[in-house]
Amino acid sequence: LCIAGSKKKTELPQKRKKIGFFIGNNFYDYLTAEENLHYYRQLKDIKDKEEVKRVLNLVGLEGVTSKYGSFSMGMKQRLGIANALLGSPEILLLDEPINGLDPQGIADIRTLIVSLNRKQNMTIIVSSHILGELEHTANKFGFVHQGTVLKEITHDDLKVKRSAVQIYVGDLEKARSVLKQNNIPVLQESSAYKSLEDYYFDLVGGKRCE
């Protein structure tokens, strides 16, 4: 295990403090967002009480006084991310952060993740089965199959390595025979890229639902 460039077992406990984890929501229904986070702040031995307000502001839950039990799914996910942000970690691990959300909730979490990455200069690792959504959010992808990382690519790799061009012409039959001569007017040309989902199934095999 290597964290922040270190493999020394004696350094791992300290290095782990630089990582924030979001794995499900373990909060008390009868407490507010702020009360729940103060509980976890103390568990993490964070002395600064203002840290709770800071992370609530980052995820857009500042001023919310209702109990956790009345939260929407999107609010619960935001609070889970806020908990992971306590202590200003350098790396944020998010496990299925958009699971169970409606389209608006997904868009909100996507915006939040991008904002944290850009404004807080934070490395964010997202584990998700919703590949189409990752394609809109991430800039680097790692494909894991049966516990093994098969390949890592960048967003640009996805386009460059798996690109195709579709050309629409007025006479398809004629185009098939004389296209190489380059003397047929092209009515429309567009670039078509394989999606992240397409790339995954090409890599590991299997068939997706159409």
Roles of regions detected by a PLM:
Residues 88:
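Conserved catalytic motifs of ABC-family nucleotide-binding domains
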Residues 81:
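Hydrophobic anchor residue at the start of the ABC signature
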Residues 38, 49-64:
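Conserved ABC ATPase "signature" region
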Residues 92-96:
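Catalytic Walker B motif of ABC-type/P-loop ATPase nucleotide-binding domains
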Residues 106-120:
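Helical segment within the ABC ATPase nucleotide-binding domain
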